[in-house]
Amino acid sequence: MAYYGFVTTLKNVRPHPNADRLQLGDCFGNTVCVNLDYYEGQVGVYFPTDGQLSVEFATQNNLLRLKDENGNNIGGYMDPDKRNVKAIKLRGEKSDGLFLPLSCLDYCYPDVYGGAAKVLKVGNRIDICNGHEICKKYIPKGNSRNSNAGGTSRTRKRKVAVAPLFSEHADTEQLAYNLSAFRPGDEIEITLKMHGTSQRTGYLPVLKGYKRTLKDRIFRKEGEPIYDWGYVTGTRRTVLDDYEGGYYGSNEFREAHSKLFEGRLWRGETVYYEVVGFTTNGSPIMGVCNNKKLNDKDFVKRYGEITTFSYGCDPDGCHGTELLKMFIPNDESEETRVVREPQSDIYVYRMTMTNEDGDVVEYTPDFMRYRCEQMGVKTVPLFAKGKIAMSGLVNLIDYRTEEDFIVAEGDETREGDPLSYEYLPGESVKKAAEIFYDGPDPVGKIHVREGVVVRIINRPKFTAYKHKNFSFKVLEGIIKESATAPDMEEAQEVENE
């Protein structure tokens, strides 16, 4: 989970409507609050939400809360321990990230006349400058959610790979900082980004044991590994030996979902999916949030006082073998068939085919949906498909309404500047994504959606970018502020550090 600050320019600087000493500006389309010293076109460093500034950087720029002997604040606004960048509202206006002048990095270049401005240019991304750590992904430190879990889940830690062809799913980068990745002729699709825990299952060559010669036995060597086709399941970073223990106290909720693919995957297939809802003890898979902390009455009126990312699941719903009966056809009568809501559910977002030489073929989204329909599993909801024209405009089909229309960033937003065909496609794609990235979750309909994922279909390798809405970013920040532990994916990042 890489995190960077971006050297960029501050645009659309304007007065804050509710604060005389503040201004608003835009970075990558995100609104930031700045003081009156900032100006249009100023070059600086933008730190997106969900990052953590280093102690050195925050101290050098007087960002940490500090009180004098009389209890008066003489420092900044950041918690000295967390130092996290989060989405907030200041006097009723969005502030989505942190923008600082480029001079904030001058201390990294003491021997360079002119400081950071002589070294860094617009477009650079930074996490370390001249040997000085600047920022990293913010991950709350702590133990697993269930301190009585009796240890973490057992994962395979051997010199020989258990499933050498079982590939991890790469992190999905932010759309706003990768607009240049889009080109005329690209085909795209926009799907729902779901807030859950990642899982993957493959039908691949799996380690079954070792062939030991007499020499191996004498010298106590393991011998030559023996592989045969079998099913293997893991989280984003680990391969699971079993479903005991783990971050959630038990990984039992994962088991039924992995078994669903047994007898259904073709040889060489790997399926990547999001698990949402609740664990077998009824705890939410992802953190909950008190919506009143947003100080937004309209949000509370729309989504209630508590956000639980349930996606239509029930904490007391069916699980285990009962859950399998929901998905696997059987000969039971309608009277005995399970009708309760699931305790957790899965949504597939990617599938691959890997041959025995390790060559990976990426399934197109349409073929992935075809295979999932054959297997009886759900895929992430599809919002729209489109193609970028040579003009840079996006011809989009809204799959919710079957409406066909064109999305573009027009001349009026560029104040008369000529259209840049190199950059316009990405801007058009971002605008298209923002048609769908906010509002109630289309699955459960009781909480805000996280955002969307924009995938470029015509690339040989999986190429996709996420775009989260502001309300979710604020919720995510509040959840992390009060968290005693990172979420599942972030917990694994800590383990891998």
Where are these regions (language model features)?
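Core nucleotide-handling region used for phosphoryl-transfer chemistry
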Residues: 1-497
